[in-house]
Amino acid sequence: MTVGQSAVSLAIFMVMGAPQRKSRKRFSGSKASGGDPMYNSNRVRMLAVSYALPPALFPQAIQIGRLLTHMPAEIGVVCGDSDESATTGGFDPGFGQGFVFRESVRYRPSLRGFPATLARRFVPFFARVPDEYRPWVRRAEAALTSRLRETAFQPNVLVTFGEPMSDHLLGLRLKARLGIPWIAHFSDPWADNPFRRYEYLATFVNRRLEQQVVQNADRIVVTSQETLDLMMSKYPPAWRRKACVLSHSFDPSLYRAPTRTDGSLVVRYLGNFYGHRSPVPLFRALKLLLDADPQCLNGVAIELVGQMPARMRLHRSLRALPNGLVLLRDTVPYAESLTLMSNSDLLLVIDGPDDLSVFLPSKLIDYLGAGVPILGIVPPGASAELLTRLHARVADPREPKAVAAALRSAIAEAAQRRKSPRSEPWGDPAIVDGYNITNVSAAFSRLVSDLLADTGGPTQ
C-alpha cells in the first residue's frame, strides 16, 4: 500500500469509524416489555434519518418533513437539533405528532462564522468529508440505539435523506447494525456536486464514501433524471438498476388565494443565492431592457427574497439600475413565502451558468403550487426541461440578450394575464399534478412496498 493509499484509508476510517456488527434479526414484530404487540407487525415500520426537519428553515427540512407526514407507515425519526437556522414558521404546527418517536440529537459546530470560513479554505478535510455534520453521526447512532431499546420499536425499513450526506454515513452504520432494507435518498449529487469546492484528496474520499453507500443501499432515490445519470454513470449496471427518480413536491392545501390590491406588476424570486447561483444575469438583463427603452419597466416591482452574499449585493450590475427597481428582502417564514408566491405576477427561477445543470430546486416545485407564471434563467438541464414542458420562458444565464428578451416577453404576458378577470392557474394541470404531495408520497409508498415485497417484509 502506498503512502497516498494509506492516507486515504485512514481518512475513510476516521469518517466511518469501526464497522458495527450486523444483526441477524429481520422483520420481527415489535414487542412491548410485557410481551404484548406494541406495533402492527403487518405495517411498514420506517426508521427515517434526516438531520434537517421542521421547524428548521431548510428546503430539505420542508420537503422531507412533508414526505414523511404523508407516508402511511409507523415512523421513528432521528434528526438534528441545532440553533443554526431560522424556523419554517407555519409549515405544520402538528408536524411529527404522528411519529412513533422523534429523536432530536443536539449538534453545535466546533467552529462558526469567520473561523469556520478560514478552516474550510485552508484546513484539509474540514467540513468536506462529507460535511460539517460528521461528528453528529455517532451521537445520533448512540441516541437512536437507546431510543429503539426504550420504545421496543423494530423498524423493517431504513430511509436516509441527504443533504447533509452525513445522514447516509449514519445509514451505513444502521444498515450493518439492523440488517434491514435501506433506501438512500439524495436531494443533490454527492461527490459530483458542482457546488462543492474541489480538493483532490477530499473529493477522492467522498467518491469512496458515496460508493459504499450506493453499494450497500437497496434502493437509491434522486430528484431528477439528470442527477441519476450523473451519479450512477460511474457504477456497474446492477447498481444503476437500484436507482430511481422521485421528485420534490408541493402541498396545495398550504396556499391561499391572492389578496393584492395594488396596481404594480410584481416579479419575485424566492430563495438563497450562493456560489455560482447569482442574480447578476437578471441585473444585466434589466439594464439591457432599460437601455433599449427607459420606460419599459414602469409599474414593475422586482423583489428578491432570501439570503444574498455581500459581493452580489454590491455588484456593479445592481448599482447600475435605478434606485427602487429591485427590492432585496431577507428570508421569510415558509408560510409567508407561499403567500408571496401566490401574490406575484411572475416568479423567477435562477441557477448558475453551466453546460448542464442537474438541479431541480424545491423552490421551483413550490412555485408550481402557486399557479403563477414562471421565468427560468437557467442553463440546460433539469429545471429547463420541466419549464419547457410547461411552456414557460427559459433563457441561459450565460446569454444576457436572451435573458433580456425572455424577461421582456414574460412580463408582457404576465401583464396581459392580469387583465383577464378569471385567470386559470398557470401550468399544464397534467404536469403540475405530478408534483402534488399526494401523488409523490404515493409513489414513494409504492417504492417502499415493492422493496419490502422483494425482501420478504410487509407491504402495507
Question: Which residues fall in each region the model found?
Answer:
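Nucleotide-sugar-dependent
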Residues: R277, P333-T339, L347-L368, I374-E385
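N-terminal subdomain of nucleotide-sugar transferases
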Residues: I12-G17, R21-F27, K31-V105, L289, ...
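Conserved donor-binding/catalytic core segment of Leloir-type glycosyltransferases
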Residues: L47, T259-R277, F283-L286, V440
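Nucleotide-sugar donor phosphate/pyrophosphate-binding loop at the beta->alpha transition
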Residues: L178-P181, A191-Q212, P252
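Membrane-proximal helix-turn-helix segments that form the acceptor-binding/catalytic region
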Residues: S166-L169, R173, L201-I220
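A charged, aromatic-enriched C-terminal amphipathic alpha-helix characteristic of glycosyltransferases
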Residues: R398-A402, A415-D450
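Carbohydrate-associated surface elements
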Residues: E226, L246-S249
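Nucleotide-activated donor-binding/catalytic signature segment of Leloir-type glycosyltransferases, i.e.
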Residues: G299, L304-L338
